[in-house]
């Protein structure tokens, strides 16, 4: 069963200033908690386009949203295809778009998905199980230099070189096939003193591999830049992130579009092409409430950023 507790459910949707007859896009359908909360605010003219690259999530969501099926279009795709998805549906602009990034609880909790460093399973980590590249290929086939790069860039792991070297040495003899095998190899690459602080020693490397397998950061960047162009004036975009890399990227993109192009000196009035595309609704990200934290420990690292489209 695909059971997932949605983080910052009310805040994410309420910040969209939902119009009863609006058209909205859920870029990360997951357990459909946000979708259900939104649909309950729409009248019969409102509609939701629900995107997920995990077929299991979509099948579960159809059950969760069974009272609203005539108001939902389910799309099995990566959210970086948002332009194509809206074009295919003959939709130009929508009233709001939202993202709940990161891994859903069921993906972490089902050992066979190969995301968890607590449970043993074959290395996988694919959010879209129809894609070819999995964690197994990354760990066993990617060269040392690429492993160092992703561990450092996506995991902010300071022992990236040592861990990549241990992986390289281990796989010379036999493939690293399971999550707990990989955990043991990672531990060997981290000095004993460092292993005792900063949470689970494999956390950062697992995050890095997951991001690489699913091309998460580039996919999000592509998607958010498209989303900004597909939301109507005064429509909003809500984004929940779960680690500093995603949050930083979201902040940078919003800032870039808020600044607008450099205005030439001496103009008596500023032409529209030099005005900002959007404004950030919250300068500082919104954090999870105590209520959220009590329900879901993952909410501790969650941050919500919201932007409103101006033109």
From Swiss-Prot:
GO biological process assignments: rRNA base methylation
Keyword 4Fe-4S in record: no
Record keywords, A-Z: Cytoplasm, Methyltransferase, rRNA processing, S-adenosyl-L-methionine, Transferase
Protein name (database record): Ribosomal RNA small subunit methyltransferase H
Listed HAMAP family: 16SrRNA_methyltr_H (MF_01007)
Record NCBIfam families: 16S rRNA (cytosine(1402)-N(4))-methyltransferase RsmH
Name of the encoding gene: rsmH
Role played: Specifically methylates the N4 position of cytidine in position 1402 (C1402) of 16S rRNA.
InterPro entries the record matches: RsmH, SAM-dep_MeTrfase_MraW_recog, SAM-dependent_MTases_sf
GO cellular component, one term: cytoplasm
Subcellular location, record wording: Cytoplasm
UniProt keyword Repeat present: no
List of residues binding S-adenosyl-L-methionine: 32-34, 52, 79, 100, 107
Origin species: Staphylococcus carnosus (strain TM300)
Superkingdom field: Bacteria
